[in-house]
């Protein structure tokens, strides 16, 4: 091991571009992990969301378009369009202490909504990674209609 440490400065000197790229990627990975840890909401898998639903009865918010919601959604979810999603709404104020899980079709726009909920003071915010597509891929039940 000490042989490697003694030759490390020589390697870095001979491969400066490679070493700088490695350091940049390492810093980016560490920064990404720190931001993930401190963002205030947790990403859930479909199995973890199922456990949350069974144990704590969270408020499920589906951010899909109304037509997509009618085609398929997680049973018990409420449909709210992202353009109409307002965490400061007086109807949501009573559930600030209750768990809230958000999802959309693919899981991209719901992450933005989760961040808005945390900013508004919600304590337990969850986001379904992969969205409804991941839920369906896990062969979990979906409801149709309103």
Regions found by a protein language model. Give the residues of each.
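Rhodanese-like catalytic fold shared by cysteine-dependent sulfurtransferases
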Residues: 2-43, 47, 52, 66-99, ...
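Structural scaffold elements adjacent to functional motifs in cytosolic proteins
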Residues: 60-62
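Metallo-beta-lactamase
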Residues: 103-104
């Amino acid at each position: 091991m000490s042989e490697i440490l003694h030759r490390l400065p020589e390697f870095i000197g001979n491969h400066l571009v490679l070493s700088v790229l490695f350091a940049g990627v390492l810093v980016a990975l560490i920064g990404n992990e720190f931001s993930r840890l401190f963002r205030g909401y947790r990403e859930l898998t479909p199995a973890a969301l199922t456990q949350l639903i069974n144990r704590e009865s969270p408020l499920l918010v589906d951010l899909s378009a109304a037509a997509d919601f009618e085609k398929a959604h997680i049973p018990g979810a409420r449909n709210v369009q992202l353009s109409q999603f307002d965490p400061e709404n007086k109807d949501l104020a009573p559930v600030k202490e209750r768990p809230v899980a958000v999802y959309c079709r693919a899981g991209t726009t719901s992450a933005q909504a989760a961040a808005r909920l945390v900013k508004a003071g919600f304590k337990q915010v969850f986001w379904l990674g992969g969205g409804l597509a991941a839920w369906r891929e896990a062969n979990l039940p979906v409801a149709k209609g309103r």
